[in-house]
Amino acid sequence: MTTPSTSTAPKTLYQKVWDAHVVATPEGEAPIIYVDRHLVHEVTSPQAFSGLKVAGRKLRAPEKTFATMDHNTSTRSASLDALSPMARTQVETLAQNCKDFGVRLYDIHHPNQGIVHVMGPELGITLPGTVIVCGDSHTATHGAFGALAFGIGTSEVEHVLATQTLRQLKAKTMKIEVRGQVTDGVTAKDIVLAIIGKIGMDGGTGYVVEFCGEAIEALSMEGRMTVCNMAIEMGAKAGMVAPDQTTFDYLEGREFAPKGEDWAEAVAAWKALKTDVGAEFDASVVLDAADIAPQLTWGTNPGQVVAIDAPVPNPADEANPTIRASMEKALDYIGLTAGTPMTDVAINKVFIGSCTNSRIEDLRSAAKQAKGRKVASGVTAIVVPGSGQVKAQAEAEGLDKIFIEAGFEWRLPGCSMCLAMNDDRLEAGDRCASTSNRNFEGRQGRGSRTHLVSPAMAAAAAIAGHFVDIRKPY
C-alpha cells in the first residue's frame, strides 16, 4: 500500500483537496478517499438504505449525511396526497430510512426543504476544501465553494453511508479561464453555455475543471454555482472555483458553517485553497468575456448553443460528418430550420427554476424583466424557487407579487420541470424557454422541446412570446 504524496511541487486547487482526502492507495487499486458531506434525496437512496438493512450495517457518520425531498415532490401542494403513488412511496421511504438511521431530513413540510444543491450551500453544509457526494449528476454545483463535489451511483451511495469513504480514480486537471468582464445582459448561465459551446459536451471528459479568470471572480456565489452546476454538461467529473472573500462572506453565519474562533481558523485555512503559481494543468481553455453574448440552445444537447443574435446553424456548414448528422437529427426533433434568427423562435412554455437557476439572484434577474409587464397570450410560465429559504426571501422582497401580477405562476420549492419525474412536465410539441441544465430529447416530457437560457432571457421570452435579445428594448 502506498502513502499519499508529500511532494512540495506546485499544486492545483483540485490536487490540494484530493491529497488531503486520500485515506489509502492499495497497490493496483483505485485510491480510497474520505467523504466530508453526503447529500441524499428520495430517488437514488432507497436501494442504498435497503442494502444496509439487509447487511445489518449502520451509518458510519450519520451526522455527515443530510437528506431532502426534491426530485418528485409537488410544487403545487405540500400534501402527500398531491404526489403520484410512486413519488409518495419514495418520499415516505426516505422519511422512514432517515428515522431508522438517524439522518437529518428536510422533508416537504420543513421550512428549509429544497433542491439538494440549493439547500446544501445556503445552510452552510457546503464548505471549502471538503469532499461532497450525492446520488445526483449535478453535485458539481458545490464546487463553487472550492469543494470537490461529484455525483455517485446508488451502489456508491450505500458504500459512503456504510464507510464514509469512496474508491475513486484521480482525474486529470483542466483550467478554464474567462478573461475580462462580461457586458450588460450577460450572466453566469451565458458564460457556462458559451464554454460548453466552445469545448463540446465531451470536452471535459476525464477532467476536474477549475474555472478562473476575472469574469469568474466577479460572479456572486449564486453565479459560480450556476457555472459549476453545468460542469457535468461538458463531460467533467467536477467543477471548482477557488474560495475568496466572496465565498467567506456568503458562508459566514450560516447554520453549519464554523462559528467563533473556529470560523477564523477555517478562513485562514481556506485562503490556502488556490492553485499555486507554477502548477501545471493537463489542459487549458481560454475565453474572452467581452465576446460572450446572451446564449440559448438550439438543439438537443447543451453544446448545441448559439448567441441570441445568431441564426440557427446550418448542418451543411459542418465538415465533420458525424457532427453534421447529429445537427440534422437535432433540428428535426427540435423543429427548427437552419438560418432562422433565434429571435424569431416562438415559445409557449417558460420554466424558471432548477438547481442551475433557482436562487434569489436568479429570481431577482427574472423579476426585473417581468416587472410591469404581462406574460404573452398563449404562454404558460412558472417560477419555482429552489428552497424554502429562497421562497421566503423572494416573498419578503415582493418578487412573488411581481411575477404573479405579470401572469407567472409562483410555486413551492422542488426540482419541478427540470425533468419529467413529477407533475410539472411539458406536453409533446411544447417549446420551452428553460433555466435548467439539460435539453435532451424528452427531458421535460415526451416530445418536449427545450431551449436552455438564463433567468432573464426566460422571463423576457415569456413576456414577448419568443426569444429576445435582452440587451435591446423589446
Swiss-Prot record:
Organism name: Shewanella sp. (strain MR-4)
Family: Belongs to the aconitase/IPM isomerase family. LeuC type 1 subfamily.
Its EC number(s): 4.2.1.33
Description of how the protein assembles with itself and partners: Heterodimer of LeuC and LeuD.
Protein residues bound to [4Fe-4S] cluster: C355, C415, C418
Cofactor: [4Fe-4S] cluster
First-tier enzyme category under EC: lyase
Protein name: 3-isopropylmalate dehydratase large subunit
Coiled coil stretches, renumbered: none
UniProtKB keywords: 4Fe-4S, Amino-acid biosynthesis, Branched-chain amino acid biosynthesis, Iron, Iron-sulfur, Leucine biosynthesis, Lyase, Metal-binding
Cofactor binding note from Swiss-Prot or TrEMBL: Binds 1 [4Fe-4S] cluster per subunit.
Catalytic activity: (2R,3S)-3-isopropylmalate = (2S)-2-isopropylmalate
Lineage top rank: taxon: Bacteria
Pathway the protein takes part in: Amino-acid biosynthesis; L-leucine biosynthesis; L-leucine from 3-methyl-2-oxobutanoate: step 2/4
SUPFAM superfamilies: Aconitase iron-sulfur domain (SSF53732)
Gene for this chain: leuC
GO molecular function, one term: metal ion binding
Function text: Catalyzes the isomerization between 2-isopropylmalate and 3-isopropylmalate, via the formation of 2-isopropylmaleate.
Pfam families tied to this protein: Aconitase
InterPro entries: 3-IsopropMal_deHydase_lsu, Acnase/IPM_dHydase_lsu_aba_1/3, Acoase/IPM_deHydtase_lsu_aba, Aconitase_4Fe-4S_BS, Aconitase_4Fe-4S_dom, IPM_dehydratase_rel_enz, IPMI_cat
Protein's UniProt keywords contain Transmembrane: no
Gene Ontology BP term (one): L-leucine biosynthetic process
